[in-house]
Amino acid sequence: MAASGLDHLKNGYRRRFCRPSRARDINTEQGQNVLEILQDCFEEKSLANDFSTNSTKSVPNSTRKIKDTCIQSPSKECQKSHPKSVPVSSKKKEASLQFVVEPSEATNRSVQAHEVHQKILATDVSSKNTPDSKKISSRNINDHHSEADEEFYLSVGSPSVLLDAKTSVSQNVIPSSAQKRETYTFENSVNMLPSSTEVSVKTKKRLNFDDKVMLKKIEIDNKVSDEEDKTSEGQERKPSGSSQNRIRDSEYEIQRQAKKSFSTLFLETVKRKSESSPIVRHAATAPPHSCPPDDTKLIEDEFIIDESDQSFASRSWITIPRKAGSLKQRTISPAESTALLQGRKSREKHHNILPKTLANDKHSHKPHPVETSQPSDKTVLDTSYALIGETVNNYRSTKYEMYSKNAEKPSRSKRTIKQKQRRKFMAKPAEEQLDVGQSKDENIHTSHITQDEFQRNSDRNMEEHEEMGNDCVSKKQMPPVGSKKSSTRKDKEESKKKRFSSESKNKLVPEEVTSTVTKSRRISRRPSDWWVVKSEESPVYSNSSVRNELPMHHNSSRKSTKKTNQSSKNIRKKTIPLKRQKTATKGNQRVQKFLNAEGSGGIVGHDEISRCSLSEPLESDEADLAKKKNLDCSRSTRSSKNEDNIMTAQNVPLKPQTSGYTCNIPTESNLDSGEHKTSVLEESGPSRLNNNYLMSGKNDVDDEEVHGSSDDSKQSKVIPKNRIHHKLVLPSNTPNVRRTKRTRLKPLEYWRGERIDYQGRPSGGFVISGVLSPDTISSKRKAKENIGKVNKKSNKKRICLDNDERKTNLMVNLGIPLGDPLQPTRVKDPETREIILMDLVRPQDTYQFFVKHGELKVYKTLDTPFFSTGKLILGPQEEKGKQHVGQDILVFYVNFGDLLCTLHETPYILSTGDSFYVPSGNYYNIKNLRNEESVLLFTQIKR
């Protein structure tokens, strides 16, 4: 291949190699063709043999330092600040220029030869390939060519081998243990050539260069750094302030340009390396003219530059991670066993680690993964891309905002928190598929989500104490740039890599010269909602058996992942009770509200969610039991209260006959006149306790009938309970059945006079206290007219009836003649002993003397020189007035009403059935307390 056609590549091509600190220098002069030297390097067979030999030996013996790739001391980083490869800027130019930089045609043939594919170890191609999932999937949609037509062959070779070829071609032994490995992974956007216009079928695309003026400036800086490398050869490199200043100056000059190229991004990477940022992931947006018009979101791609001085002289790879061969298992050294145990734990505790804890973890875990590539099992590789790409995307989102000065696409640098979370959670299903590929069991995929959530919730206390203990060691070692979320996600991914490498010990590593990297056809998937609490997926919230297993996980937080997976599978197989599901659903709704409330402020800690969701089923179960108990108690209490009320209403007035207490019974009330009277019934059954006075109409009952009814009531005994409750239907005590709490009644025999007896509650309202049976209800009629007329009519009618009945009975029983009550009676005079006629009988409603004064009425039925009897009627709230009896003696009987009687100076409240008398020479006064008439019978003894 003629080198004259590639003269414009000589400067930029040499800068594509990241030369290590101990690499031999190439003293080039102006006009000297560097491609000739590179061509000789690629054609040297002995060097290729050594290259393959050292690569095979170095893999199993190399100690992988996982965390050293993330955290290096500033001194180590400054030591390697000079021998950086000068960045390559890609630009769309001619289609005839090949994208793969080839020193010679022999190199091109060696790239495609399968034999050489198996002799060079491409350890960092597949695992470090970090394409953006969204960008690659959308780029596959908008691309116009097939997958086979757009393969990118990027076989750069080891720059140290190429550089050493000039000084000593025959040297075969290259030290592999004296150098340290440091990986720089950064994400860049390759300006894709529009395949629809400028790429022919099955073409190899080329790296083109623009901004030659900037590259010349960089070349001058590089030559100065080469001269410094000569002076410091054989010694350990130290930080060079002048080199750093030159790199910063060159970076700032490039950033003044309107658009950023790959070289600009690489200089930023060099600068950040000297500022103790060991892994730099940068997102560079390509110029708009270098991409198809439809690929507005498909611009970004990722480059991984891996400097490794561990196995042989520095191997530097610039890879374009597209769809490539599958990822095989990574090897691990036996010295990692203690670190791997902590690595397993760190994947569950990633959600609540502080940034300083992350820095401590990066220093404490030091195995370095050696990732190999194998052209089989493409599905696992795609998932590994998602795994690594998710880490790079998280870190890039913060680095882009801090360092990227490109303003062409500001919308990408201002993503919302919700979009970042979606990108973060995108790789979670892919991580589970990695575990499926390693164990060859597809069923484990469903259990990983369960296992992650379960073990995070169960081990959080123990792990938080351990992490806080480690925080004291590394308080000052914090990531320089990046938010808490991106650092947390990065720590999670690195712990995933450790766990993945522990499962793949003692695996053979194939050798390849180049890696055929094609476009990835991964489908963009929605982020996994692991943070959403689901009752059916997370057994911690819904399965009652998990509560029994939680102490086991708290006590055995260092168990292996397999045991946890098995336990999670067993938990998933168990059935969930229906009541627990309902309870868990209620708890999950609370947790979801809690998450929504906290969503604007950031990510909610999983320990809070787990505490809420774990305690809520227990609390809800206890609440259900307590609620049922309270319900049962309330029902029983209510029924017992009803019974007590009924018994109180029944038992309080029901006193023995000897006690003399009386209870009130309802009598007939006059709605028109509002006049009332009472009747005396002792031990007459349940009655209203709060109702002292029962309304009644004007008295239409004569004295004899009232006394007769009272006598009948005295003869009746206490009404049994079944007489009171035979109509009541109390609430049933059914724990699991929803029944009414009302006190129901069977149909009442209203035609017999059955009525409901209501009792007033202290809080207001009424409560059914029982049913008034016909035995307790008075059958007295209500008076509708004047008391005189009513009494006359009713009494006359009753007298006639009674007389007829008497006559009938007497005629049947006795055969004697009867006297006329209206006629005087023949009696013997005591003094003269002669027979005289006297009025001894006074029929009803007949009187000898009548006095009316307002509402006060006095009827004298019998009046003799020695005594007189009669009836005193007081109107509603009427007072008789204070009166002196003189020499007479007055005897009173309260026929109906409630009275305030004052005997000389002592007041008394007397009611129906009471009697009192006033001795001679004293005063008395009577006042009606009711709103109806009160009736008293009196007897005056004359002296």
Curated annotation (Swiss-Prot):
Which stretch carries the motif Nuclear localization signal?
259-273, 484-499, 558-574, 780-798
Q: What UniProt keywords apply to this chain's record, in alphabetical order? A: Cell cycle, Cell division, Centromere, Chromosome, DNA-binding, Isopeptide bond, Kinetochore, Mitosis, Nucleus, Phosphoprotein, Ubl conjugation
Q: Where is the composition biased (Polar residues)?
A: 633-672
**UniProt subcellular location:** Nucleus; Chromosome, Centromere, Kinetochore; Chromosome, Centromere
**What cellular component terms from Gene Ontology apply here?**
condensed chromosome, centromeric region; cytosol; inner kinetochore; kinetochore; midbody; nuclear body; nucleoplasm; nucleus
What InterPro entries does the entry give?
Answer: CENP-C/Mif2/cnp3, CENP-C_mid, CENP-C_N_dom, Mif2/CENP-C_cupin, RmlC-like_jellyroll, RmlC_Cupin_sf
List compositional bias (Basic residues) regions by residue number: 412-426, 570-583
The protein's GO terms of the molecular function aspect are: centromeric DNA binding; DNA binding; identical protein binding
| Chain intervals for the UniProt region annotation (MIF2 homology domain II) | 737-759
Please name every pair of cysteines joined by a disulfide bond in this record: none
Start and end residues of each stretch annotated as MIF2 homology domain III: 890-943
Please list the residues that carry the modification Phosphoserine.
73, 96, 146, 189, 225, 261, 316, 333, 376, 397, 439, 528, 538, 684, 709-710, 763, 773
Which Gene3D superfamilies does the record cross-reference, listed alphabetically?
Answer: Jelly Rolls (2.60.120.10)
Give cross-link positions for Glycyl lysine isopeptide (Lys-Gly) (interchain with G-Cter in SUMO2).
45, 119, 134, 180, 212, 217, 238, 260, 271, 273, 297, 440, 534, 677, 727, 807
Superkingdom of source:
Eukaryota
Q: Which Pfam families match?
A: CENP-C_C, CENP-C_mid, CENP_C_N
The Basic and acidic residues compositionally biased stretches are 224-239, 438-463, 488-510, 706-715
User: What's the subunit arrangement here?
Assistant: Oligomer. Component of the CENPA-NAC complex, at least composed of CENPA, CENPC, CENPH, CENPM, CENPN, CENPT and CENPU. The CENPA-NAC complex interacts with the CENPA-CAD complex, composed of CENPI, CENPK, CENPL, CENPO, CENPP, CENPQ, CENPR and CENPS. Binds to DAXX. Interacts with DNMT3B. Interacts directly with CENPA. Identified in a centromere complex containing histones H2A, H2B and H4, and at least CENPA, CENPB, CENPC, CENPT, CENPN, HJURP, SUPT16H, SSRP1 and RSF1. Interacts with MEIKIN.
Q: What is known of its domains?
A: The MIF2 homology domain II targets centromeres and binds the alpha satellite DNA in vivo. The MIF2 homology domain III can induce CENPC dimerization/oligomerization.
Q: What biological function has been recorded for the protein in this entry?
A: Component of the CENPA-NAC (nucleosome-associated) complex, a complex that plays a central role in assembly of kinetochore proteins, mitotic progression and chromosome segregation. The CENPA-NAC complex recruits the CENPA-CAD (nucleosome distal) complex and may be involved in incorporation of newly synthesized CENPA into centromeres. CENPC recruits DNA methylation and DNMT3B to both centromeric and pericentromeric satellite repeats and regulates the histone code in these regions.
UniProt-recorded name of the protein: Centromere protein C
